[in-house]
Amino acid sequence: MKMNPDDIRELRDRTGLGLSDCKKALEECDGDIKKAVDKLRTIGLAKADKKSDRVASDGLVAMCLTENCGVLIELNCETDFVARNEKFIELVLNLASIAHQERCTSVDELKNAKYESIGTVQEAIMNGTSVLGEKLELSKLCYLEAKDGVIAGYVHGDVCGLGKIGALIALQSPGDKAKLQEIGKQIAMHIVAMKPEALSIDDLDQMKLKNERSIIEEQVRSLNKPEEVAKKIVDGRMAKYYEEVVLLEQKFIKDDKMKVSDFIKSSEVSAVKLSNYKLLVLGGAN
C-alpha cells in the first residue's frame, strides 16, 4: 500500500518522530492516522523509557503571568544544546501556559493535565524525550494567586519569559494595577539577584535562626565584653544576618540607601502589602 506523503507529513507534525518511523507506522495501520498516532506514541514512550536513568541537569525556567495569577515551571534536559532547541523551547512555553490555564499548583497536577493532540503533559514530555534524544523531566512548579492585588514576575534570561532563574511576587493593594505591576517587577528582579530565604523575619526557619544566633553568641562571648555591650553586638550581627536573607530587610538592589520594605512604602500606590513570593532557580532546591 502506497502511503500518502501528506499523511506522513501530518503524522510527523503530530508526533515529532522520524520519517521512517511514521511511514512504517502508517503501513502497519493501513493508512489510519489515528491508529498510527497511538502506535507511534507507544514507540516514543519506549524510547523515552530507555533514557529514564540518565541525569537531566540543564534546561529552562518558564513563566506565564496574568494580572492576578502567575506560574513558574522548570523543565530539565541533559545539555545546553537541547535547552536552546526550538522544539524544547516550544514545549516549555506550552507547559507553562497549560499550568497557568489549569491553575496547577503542583508538578503532579501539571503532569496529569491534558496536552492537546498527545494526551497528558507527562506523555508530551516522554514524546519530547524520544524526539530530542535526551531525558526530559518536569522538576518544579511555583504558583501564586492574588485576589485583591496583582501578581508580578521576572525571569532572567535571553528569551522573554524563559531563562535559568525566575521570581513571582504577590502585591495586595486597592491602588492602580499598572503601577503595582511595575513595582512588583522591580521587586521580582531584586529577588532574582539577591535570592532571599524568607519574606519576613517571622517567616525564617526557626531552627536555622536559633542555630545562627547561637553561633553569633558564641563568637561574641569570646570577646569578653560586658553583658550589655555583648547583647548589642549580638543584636547588631543578627540585624546584619536579616539583611542578607530576609526580603523585606534586604537593601533594595536599585537603591541601597533603602530596604525593600522602604521601597514599597515610598511607592506612589497606597497601602501596598507584599504578601508572598516564589523563587525558582534552575537546578536549585524547591
Swiss-Prot record:
GO cellular component, one term: cytoplasm
Keyword Cytoplasm part of the UniProt annotation: yes
Pfam (any one): EF_TS
Residue ranges, annotated region (Involved in Mg(2+) ion dislocation from EF-Tu): 79-82
Annotated transmembrane regions: none
Family annotation (InterPro entries): EF-Ts_dimer_sf, Transl_elong_EFTs/EF1B, Transl_elong_EFTs/EF1B_dimer, Transl_elong_Ts_CS, UBA-like_sf
Location relative to the cell: Cytoplasm
Family of this protein: Belongs to the EF-Ts family.
Protein name per the record: Elongation factor Ts
Organism of this sequence: Wolbachia sp. subsp. Drosophila simulans (strain wRi)
